[in-house]
C-alpha cells in the first residue's frame, strides 16, 4: 500500500512568534496547557539536547502536514548540565563554530545557521537525510543507520568504552561501502579533527 501524501509538500506557515512559542514550550511546559495546533505534530530526534524540527519551503518556516517530512532541526542551548556543574549556555555558538572549522578542514558537514526567534536562540541544522525529488515537488526521507545498528549492537552500547563499535569496526564497515577510500579518509580526518 502506497502512503498517502508522500508525493507532495504540505505545511502550515509559522510566524517568528509561533516558532518562539514552540521553542519556549520545549523547555517550559505549562501544566495542563497544550498547543492544540501542534497536537498532530510529533517528532523523535535522538540526543540529550532540547530540539525540534520544522519544514522550510521557499524561505517560509512551516509545520509539516501529513506525510511531509521536516527539513531542518532546531537545537536549543544546553544550559547548565551535570548537576549544574557545567555551563553550556553557549552550545549553539560552539556547535556552529565547530561545524565551520570542520568544513574548513574539508569534512562534509550539514549546513548550519544561528537564528533568534524572540528571546529564543537556536542552531538551525539542515537535515542531511532529506532530498528534494520530482523537480522539488516533494521531499524524500533517506534512511540512515548508525554504527550500533550496522554492527547489531544495542543502543546502550553505543560507546566503545561500553563495548560498542570501535575504529576497526567502523573502518571495516566503511571498506564494504560504495566509496571505501573516500569514506575511510573522511573518517580518519574526522578522528584527527576531534
Map each language-model feature to its residues.
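Phosphate/dinucleotide-binding and metal-coordinating scaffold of catalytic cores
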Residues: 1-194
Amino acid at each position: 500500500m502506497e502512503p498517502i501524501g508522500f508525493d507532495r509538500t504540505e505545511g502550515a506557515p509559522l510566524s517568528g512568534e509561533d516558532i518562539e512559542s514552540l521553542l519556549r514550550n520545549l523547555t517550559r511546559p505549562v501544566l495542563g496547557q497544550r498547543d492544540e495546533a501542534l497536537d498532530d505534530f510529533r517528532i523523535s530526534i535522538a540526543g540529550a539536547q532540547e530540539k525540534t524540527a520544522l519544514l522550510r519551503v521557499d524561505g517560509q518556516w512551516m509545520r509539516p502536514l501529513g506525510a511531509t517530512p521536516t527539513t531542518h532541526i532546531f537545537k536549543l542551548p544546553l544550559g547548565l548540565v551535570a548537576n549544574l556543574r557545567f555551563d553550556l549556555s553557549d552550545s549553539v555558538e560552539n556547535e556552529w563554530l565547530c561545524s565551520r572549522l570542520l568544513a574548513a578542514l574539508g569534512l562534509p558537514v550539514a549546513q548550519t545557521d544561528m537564528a533568534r526567534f524572540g528571546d529564543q536562540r537556536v542552531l538551525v541544522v539542515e537535515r542531511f537525510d532529506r532530498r528534494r525529488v520530482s523537480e522539488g515537488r516533494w521531499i524524500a526521507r533517506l534512511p540512515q543507520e548508525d554504527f550500533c545498528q550496522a554492527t547489531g549492537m544495542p543502543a546502550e552500547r553505543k560507546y566503545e568504552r561500553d563495548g560498542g563499535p570501535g575504529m576497526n569496526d567502523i573502518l571495516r564497515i566503511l571498506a564494504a561501502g560504495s566509496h571505501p577510500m573516500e569514506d575511510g579518509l573522511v573518517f580518519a580526518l574526522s578522528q584527527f579533527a576531534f
